[in-house]
Amino acid sequence: MIQGLDINHREVFVKANAKAGETFRMDLQSYTGTLHDEFHLIVDLEEHDRKLRKAYYDIAVPMYGLNRMKEDDKIRLDLETALTDTINLLDLRMPYSKEFYASVEAAEAHIQEAVYEKMGGYEEVIATCIGHTHIDVAWLWTVDQVRQKSCRSFATVLKLMEEYPDYHFMSSQPKLYSFVKERHPEMYQRIKDRVKEGRWEPEGGMWVEADCNLTSGESLVRQFQFGKRFFKEEFGVENKILWLPDVFGYSAALPQIMKKCGIEYFMTTKLAWNEFDKHPYDSFLWEGIDGSRIFTHLITTLGVGQSESSFFTTYNGMLHPDAIMGGWERYQNKEINNDILI
């Protein structure tokens, strides 16, 4: 298995320098969910110019960032000038000509100096970006599809790690790892290798991302018992974080249970999804019934095109200026912390 393909993963990198006449075979397996519609699969073979793609994103990222700045901000005015000068250097009369590539090189050199060297490196605010995939073990699909989806998603991560040496990834739910171990032991070994490198983080505390409203106290304890034991035995790591991005509510006894199970930190999202009685804190100490305290953080990441005033935040953040800048704008505890989680 090479990787998964879906609406967010539309490309498969085949080879860096293919030779004329080389043949590549690719087998596809598809699943349409509960929809009974007819879908048409269209495949194109593309040649990617890495320098051209880099120049595109180096221009696009600050351009999208402008939309979140006030019109009279000095940084915005300077950025508009730098972007205008960069675009004016491009010769678009004959794309892919010698003159075109020379102009792209000149534009890239200019934006690197004018934007990324002179305006970049602002360290008073930090966005810690964590690669992550959220998979529901039980939702609108069969358990067999969960098994397959786990393998596809983890294969995609391993493929991205080959292409991007600086890419780091975190994933919870030992149950998903057990699916991969059963179906693709060779992939599971590659995951273990990445864990040893420090690029793959098996973390999350529980066996699955469990409901915490209806679940009994004993069941919650066993979630931690089975989850922490699996990650310790399989990867040699001791979980300290309860990672529940997609759960809607929590028992008041949970801080006590977490403390007793060796959990020090808690991350969630949906407690901040109230439209009217908005939760006043994003980073705080959650005190349980017995007085146990757990450091808790609510994700503040915004979706692409989403306003700061929206009550909705997402644990499926895109690496986009709207998510990063919007996440800081949305964060309510700037006086105690300058590092947000994306």
Give, region by region, the residue ranges found by the protein language model:
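Catalytic-domain carbohydrate-binding cleft regions of carbohydrate-active enzymes
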Residues: 1, 5-342
